[in-house]
Each structure stands twice: as structure tokens, then as C-alpha cells.
Curated annotation (Swiss-Prot):
Region entry Domain IV, binds dsDNA, spans: 330-451
Name used for this protein in its record: Chromosomal replication initiator protein DnaA
Upper taxonomic lineage: Bacteria, Bacillati, Bacillota, Bacilli, Lactobacillales
Residues that coordinate or bind ATP: G155, G157, K158, T159
PANTHER family tied to this protein: CHROMOSOMAL REPLICATION INITIATOR PROTEIN DNAA
Record-linked Gene3D superfamilies: 1.10.1750.10, 1.10.8.60, P-loop containing nucleotide triphosphate hydrolases
InterPro entries, alphabetized: AAA+_ATPase (IPR003593), Chromosome_initiator_DnaA (IPR001957), Chromosome_initiator_DnaA-like (IPR020591), Chromosome_initiator_DnaA_CS (IPR018312), DnaA_C (IPR013159), DnaA_dom (IPR013317), P-loop_NTPase (IPR027417), Trp_repressor/repl_initiator (IPR010921)
Function description: Plays an essential role in the initiation and regulation of chromosomal replication. ATP-DnaA binds to the origin of replication (oriC) to initiate formation of the DNA replication initiation complex once per cell cycle. Binds the DnaA box (a 9 base pair repeat at the origin) and separates the double-stranded (ds)DNA. Forms a right-handed helical filament on oriC DNA; dsDNA binds to the exterior of the filament while single-stranded (ss)DNA is stabiized in the filament's interior.
Species of the source: Streptococcus uberis (strain ATCC BAA-854 / 0140J)
Region (Domain I, interacts with DnaA modulators), start-end ranges: 1-101
Subunit structure and binding partners: Oligomerizes as a right-handed, spiral filament on DNA at oriC.
Gene behind this protein: dnaA
Length: 451
């Protein structure tokens, strides 16, 4: 493309993204491309099923970009994959689509994100079962857990696991027919095929897969469009009856998909349902340690731990924080990211993030001391009698659980102890309460007093 053509196309993409939902933009716009602009006509390569959407929703975008870049009224000529050399006659009404062109669409595209793999997925206690189940499905699709239903809040790695499964299956069998799609985009495709009267093609596309990966299936429950759930039900049955693997993700359990037909809910529970919860501190540190390799900055350990303490709800917040820091560091030409710099960079993000109630570590020490009959001074000191050691370790555990302080900061509040001592105490108590119900009850009692 010429320089002006590049500017023109980038402006179209920019305007389209600002006006459309992200999922709609990704589905209808991202795979289109500009072939040329000649004689005030823009030739755009497009999936034929998406032409109607462009004509109805993006005409003004193209006109605006045309006047901005070429100072001219730019009309559009859509070309399809097997027809790039010929022009398609435009019509604003009674639009006719070439069935021959639609039937000549290429083999299924997976739409997987190649950057997501099992190797770069950070495991922790909160996602261990989901990872194990995903690996089992990737190794023996259609036999172990079918369907696999992964649920959890946003930004916890569900999409990563879906793509990791698909990429692993294709690595093992490049000829496998794999499809990743959001429920929202499944609905979009359904609507398009209904309009074009090409439902047989939709059925052929989805019912002949080896692996179907559906993200955010709860979106299907929100739609009342007649026939959408019916079509997915039939697709599910066709795949399952042929021992083809289905993996679904959701922000809630199958039983809480209230607007979904009961027969679908029942089928979602045929296989295995696994949950992903927010990452614990160690996992957040591991995620950050992995992510910072993408940046050309030095992150001291105390900065990493500080950031891990600031965002405890999902991975996206951590990734967003690193982008904020990168922006500030590049602007200030800083190579080493200190805690102060990190705090400055994420200030705005923290204002939009649910904040943990500020609890002084001294308050935790006081309540733990009262419960176990020891003083705060003894908790901070080095005396190692059994009851004092237990109180000290419980207080460190609660300081980690109930505050966003870094390990070094907590250690400083406990007589200047090293961060490794705090981590040891935290892990010890965390493991003990799994086996010791009485200790778990004691800690819950103390937590209630602190709150």
C-alpha cells in the first residue's frame, strides 16, 4: 500500500474500534484488509458473510476516513477470497450475495492466539485442577472430560487455558479441526447465516470440528434471539455424539446460567466442572516475575512484591499495572523500577480498583496477642517458646492475608525479620489449617475480631 492508503486504512480501523464493541470489532473488522484505493474507490478484501455488516455499520467510517486522508468521497468495492480480481456490484437494498463465493471459503480457521500455551501459564493452588483437567483434555480430546467446563471471574486465565488446549492439540495433530470462538461471536455468525439463508454452512462449519472451544458461554444465556440456543444445543449434541471435545468457559457455574435452557445446563454438567479463583500472593509474584521479562526495566524483588500486594483480584490488573509503569518509566527515562515509581504509576488504576480495608499490622499483632495470651513486644522479639512462636506465625499469616503490605514491610514490623521468614510462617500456617480444623477456627475468630 502507498503511504496514504496505509493512513486511510489505519484511520478506518481506529474509527471502527472506537464505535464498536471490542468483540464485534474483532469479529467483523480485524480480518478485513485494504487492497487499494484507485479512482476514489477503495477495494476492500472481506469475508463475504460480513459484507452486509460493513455496508450497514461502517459506511460513515469509510466516508470520514476518505475525506480526512484524500479530501474526497471514497466509495467501496468489496472483494472476496476467490474473487479478488473482480468487482462486486454494490446495492443499498435487496443485496445479493454470491453463494458460489460463500461456498468457496477456506477450511476452518482456528482463531487461536499462538502466544497462549501451557508452558507460559503460571500455576498456583487456585488453578491447579483447571490446568490438570485442561492438560488431560489436550492429551486425549473427546475421551477424558467431555465437556470440560471452566468457570471463574474475569482475568483469571480461562481464555489462556482455552487457547493452550487448542494450540497443544494442533501441535500434536496439525490437521485437527479446531475452533476457538466467544459465545458472542457464535451468536453473530448465527445471525449472519440466518440473514443469508445459509444455515447449512454454519452447521457444516461447527458440527464437523474435532475440538470446539467456547469462551464466555454465559453470553448465550443473555440472548433471547429465537433459535440461537437451539442451534448450539444441536451443535453440542452432534459433536458429543461423535466423541469430539467441547470446552466451555463461564463467569459462573452451569447451575447459575439462569436464562439458559435446562437441557443445555444438563449437558454442560455431563463432563467435569472446574473453578479458577483469584491468584494468591505467591502466584501473583510468579506471574509478575514472568511478565516483567517482556519489559526492558529492572524490577527489584521488593517492587514485585509491592505490586503483588496491590492487586489481588485478577491477572489483568497486574498486566495493566506493568503497562502503566512502562509508560511512566519510558517518559522519565528510568531503568530501575522502585516501589515509589511503581506506586506513582499505578495510582490512577488503584483508584478504580476495589481497595482492601486498611488494617494496621499492629492491630493484627494486638488481637493475636490477646487471643494467645502474649504481648506485642513478645511477638516482635526473638523468644521461641511454643505459644509465642505460634502467635508470631499466625500474626505474620494474617498480615499477609489481610493487608497489602509486601513481605519485607511485614518483616520490618515483626522486629526487622527477613522476608523469607515471613513467607515461611505464612506457608506453614496455610498448610497447617488444611489439616488442623481447630487452628482454622482460631484464626477465623481472630480475623473477625480484627475486622
Amino acid at each position: 500500500m502507498t503511504e496514504n492508503e496505509t493512513i486511510f486504512w489505519n484511520r478506518i480501523l481506529e474509527l471502527a474500534q472506537s464505535q464498536l464493541k471490542q468483540t464485534t470489532y474483532e469479529f467483523f473488522v480485524l480480518d478485513a484488509r485494504l487492497v487499494k484505493v484507485e479512482n476514489q474507490v477503495a477495494t476492500i478484501y472481506l469475508d463475504p458473510m460480513k459484507e452486509l455488516f460493513w455496508e450497514q455499520n461502517l459506511k460513515d467510517v469509510i466516508l470520514t476516513a476518505g475525506f480526512e486522508v484524500f479530501n474526497a468521497h471514497i466509495s467501496v468495492n468489496y472483494q472476496f477470497e476467490d474473487d479478488l480480481a473482480s468487482e462486486i456490484e454494490e446495492s443499498t437494498s435487496n443485496h445479493i450475495f454470491s453463494r458460489q463465493t460463500i461456498n468457496s471459503l477456506p477450511a476452518i480457521t482456528s482463531d487461536l492466539n499462538p502466544k497462549y500455551s501451557f508452558d507460559n501459564f503460571i500455576q498456583g493452588d487456585e488453578n491447579r485442577w483447571a490446568v490438570a483437567a485442561s492438560l488431560a483434555v489436550a492429551n486425549t480430546p473427546g475421551t477424558t472430560y467431555n465437556p470440560l467446563f471452566i468457570w471463574g471471574g474475569p482475568g483469571l486465565g480461562k481464555t489462556h487455558l482455552l487457547n493452550a488446549i487448542g494450540n497443544a492439540v494442533l501441535l500434536d495433530n496439525p490437521k485437527a479441526r479446531v475452533k476457538y470462538i466467544t459465545a458472542e461471536n457464535f451468536i453473530n455468525e448465527f445471525v449472519i447465516h440466518i440473514r443469508l439463508d445459509t444455515m447449512d454452512e454454519l452447521k457444516e462449519k461447527f458440527r464437523n470440528l474435532d475440538l470446539l472451544l467456547i469462551d464466555d458461554i454465559q453470553s448465550l444465556a443473555k440472548k433471547t434471539l429465537l433459535g440461537t440456543q437451539e442451534e448450539f444445543f444441536n451443535t453440542f449434541n452432534a459433536l458429543h455424539n461423535n466423541n469430539k471435545q467441547i470446552v466451555l468457559t463461564s463467569d459462573r457455574t452451569p447451575d447459575h446460567l439462569n436464562d439458559l435452557e435446562q437441557r443445555l445446563v444438563t449437558r454442560f454438567k455431563w463432563g467435569l466442572t472446574v473453578n479458577i479463583t483469584p491468584p494468591d500472593f505467591e502466584t501473583r509474584v510468579a506471574i509478575l516475575t514472568n511478565k516483567i521479562q517482556e519489559y526492558n526495566f529492572t524490577f527489584p524483588q521488593d517492587t514485585i512484591e509491592y505490586l503483588a500486594g496491590q492487586f489481588d483480584s485478577n491477572v489483568r490488573d497486574l498486566e495493566g499495572a506493568l503497562k502503566d509503569i512502562s509508560l511512566v518509566a519510558n517518559f522519565k527515562e528510568i531503568d530501575k523500577i522502585t516501589v515509589d515509581i511503581a506506586a506513582e504509576a499505578i495510582r490512577a488504576r488503584k483508584q478504580d480498583t476495589p481497595k482492601m480495608t486498611i488494617i494496621p499490622i499492629e492491630e493484627i499483632q494486638t488481637q493475636v496477642g490477646k487471643f494467645y495470651g502474649v504481648t506485642v513486644k513478645e511477638i516482635k522479639a526473638t523468644k521461641r517458646t511454643q505459644n509465642i512462636v505460634l502467635a508470631r506465625q499466625v500474626a505474620m499469616f494474617l498480615a499477609r492475608e489481610m493487608t497489602d503490605n509486601s513481605l519485607p514491610k511485614i518483616g520490618k514490623e515483626f522486629g526487622g525479620r527477613d522476608h523469607s521468614t515471613v513467607l515461611h510462617a505464612y506457608n506453614k500456617i496455610k498448610n497447617m489449617i488444611i489439616e488442623d480444623e481447630s487452628l482454622r477456627i482460631e484464626i477465623e475468630t481472630i480475623k473477625n475480631k480484627i475486622k
